[in-house]
Amino acid sequence: MRLLVCDTSDKNCSAGIFEDGKEICYELSFESKTHSETFMPLVHIVMAKAGVKHEDLDGYAVTVGPGSFTGIRIGVAAVKGMALAAGKKCIAVSSTEALARSCENATMTPKNETLIVPAIDARNNRVFAQAAEDDTLKALIPEDAYDADALTEKISKIPEVIYGKRRQILVVGSGATVMKKAFEKAGYGLNIYYAPGAAIMPKGVAAAAFAGKELIDARDLKASYCAVSQAERLKKNG
């Protein structure tokens, strides 16, 4: 199966072509321009590099959130439009799962001994995050929007952490700095590593997409925000 994989859910954006889980090519954008300016040019570049047209694809995979509300809207709308025009199906990928899969093999301990916490900065001491086993990516704390202090407490109470089965915690993504402050304030004495520079990579989106995710009709592709946007909160509050 050949997929165009895409991410616009955080500060950077990316696109890539993968076939049966193997990378053909990909492009990343770290520019200060908005995703509305950079995303579709990236798609055109990777399609040209791979020598494929939309009719040559079997589908599209895109991160649907949580993350940047504006970025998610851009990515989901663009992928939905491409898929509808080409008559192809889509795969919805969790942003935090894609982030975790982008950081596979980054742990200091052997597989099955680390708790990985992909965290995306949601501002105001909040993160979009989950906590999962590094080997199976089974979520021990589900993906949601969390207050950083509350999340650190939840993590400290996970039985696998308490009893040492997961003897290292790896916090990755733009929310790692927020989580570091929260853990340091709490003083739990846990063995924690932080990778604030870690980002969602096309290989992470592809790994999630090829991990048995369902192909859905493009019309059913929806964003997963996990929170109400600031604009919507202000509107609601008058």
Predicted regions and their residues:
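N-terminal beta-alpha supersecondary unit
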Residues: M1-V64
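Surface "functional belts" at beta-alpha junctions
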Residues: K22, E31-T34, K89-A199, Y225, ...
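Short, contiguous clusters of charged residues that form electrostatic/catalytic patches at enzyme active sites
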Residues: E37, P41-A48, A98-R101, D149-E153, ...
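Stable alpha-helical structural segments in soluble proteins, enriched in small hydrophobic residues
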Residues: V46-A50, A85, C103, M201-E214
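Acyltransferase
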Residues: Y193-G238
